[in-house]
Amino acid sequence: MKKRLLLIVVLLLKGMSSLEAETNVMKWKPYGFVRNFFCYDSRKSLRSSGEMFNMIPLDRDLNKYGDDLNQTGDVSFLAITSRLGINVSGMQFMNADLSGKIEADFNGFSGSTTMLRLRQAFMQLKWQHSRVVIGQTWHPITEYVTPDVFSLASGSPFNPFSRSPQVRYDYEWKRFICTAAALYQFQYTSPGPEGYSAEYAKNAIVPELFFSTAYSHQDITLGFGVDYLELRPRTTSLDNQNVKVKVSDRVRSISPI
């Protein structure tokens, strides 16, 4: 997290130091909220974020007497999704509006202790019809199709949900917007031989690639896109002589959206 915060600060300072006869009035706007989230579940479910983000109820787990062991309820009452953030704006660089955001909550778990967790940390260069985003923010598909709702987990597991380090380019033409992005994994990771981990994507070297085109008018948004993901689940294995050797196994997927 410290490396990502440092990267954003360096990029912002670099942009500021390169200003030549351009407007340089930095504006800081803090924001945030306190959320005390109470939830009652009548059944055991697949959950995350301190068991507050409910994704899907677990299937029946019957014992020999026919009792469903997952048919039991529980409650959660936590404030860890309270949020703090700062928006930075008011600068110009390369004839573009330069802005940035740093956002965190308290949903970083270490055992039974919660810690400050990085949600977003990025800079943005915005021209009249295009923009470049560098840093950790919402996955491109999530930004345009996720409604603002009160509940923490509304729409899961069908609602796309991911914040990732990325380099993204958006171009707007009339009511259309075209997006190209290269993304890396951080918190939201892929499953593999050692469980969920970002190592499989890191070992593959190639970033996740995303391309899309969308049409938006008033309350209607229509679009299509494609997402390419390449993973390298392992880098070594044992041969017939029980000697550890290098392997180049890869898993590739193309997902139309």
Identify the function of each model-found stretch:
Residues 1-2:
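N-terminal secretory signal peptides that target proteins for export/translocation
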Residues 48-58, 237-245:
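Solvent-exposed, glycine/polar-rich loop segments of beta-barrel outer-membrane systems
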Residues 218-257:
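Detector for outer-membrane/organellar transmembrane beta-barrel domains
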Residues 145-146, 181, 189-194, 225, ...:
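A short secondary-structure junction signal
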Residues 8, 18-19:
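Cleavable N-terminal signal peptides
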Residues 5-13:
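Sec-dependent N-terminal signal peptides
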Residues 23-50, 60-188, 205-206, 210, ...:
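Outer membrane beta-barrel
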Residues 69-72, 107, 150-155, 190-199, ...:
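Extracellular loop and loop/strand-boundary signature of outer-membrane beta-barrel proteins
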